[in-house]
Amino acid sequence: MKKFRGTFTVMITPFSGDGFKINFDSLEKFIDWQIRQGIHGLIGLGSTGEFLSLNEEERYNVSKRIIDRTDGKVPVLIGTGAENTWDVIRYSREAELLGADGVMIIPPFYSTPTENELFNHFKKVADSISIPIMLYNNPATANVDLTPDIVKHLSEIDNVSYIKESTMDVTRVRDIIRLCEDKMTVFGGIMGYESFLNGALGWVAVGSNIMPSEFAKLFKLSVINKNIDEARSIYKNIFPIIE
């Protein structure tokens, strides 16, 4: 099982000019370019990929094309979030059968589940697949906040082993690492650079759709080389994209 580290682009989904069809030629070219630019991983069908705007056939076809085109060169995660647990299970099984290295799952975003309901939801999904689950915490869009204490509870599920922590509070990165220890690897969301400084080992980045090389380099300088001064210089250059 691959370990996920580095900057992962949460990918756009290219459409035709009229907005009615997915542009698969552009999608393949985009994947090739991302890999050439040195990105460490790709995530399809996240919020940036407009997963809620796609029907089931489109979700399947986009997932398959991303996985096939990447061809193992970098890890691929597929967003399999849905309101219904059984839909999440179906999408997640499908992603695994297609060859995804993992799935990224936002909590049910309308029903505001309790902590125990969240645990049961993710436990049922985890029991249905053998690849890792990356939790996606974005309370601004999901209407659910996976607090560090809840994440600790969810980390008791064997293959719930990653989280995209996408609030503006980077102290959560520190707290999740402290509470979960080696059971949970934290990826920053919006605050990638700041998350690295607090111990995150990855970044699920939107801006790397535009500047993959620079976003990947920021991870290397911050986490691998520990060259904070040079990392800060790159961060200043890419901040307008992040903002």
Predicted regions and their residues:
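Active-site beta->alpha loop and helix N-cap motifs at the rims of alpha/beta catalytic domains
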Residues: 2-145, 151
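Catalytic alpha/beta core domains of metabolic enzymes, predominantly
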Residues: 127-128, 139-243
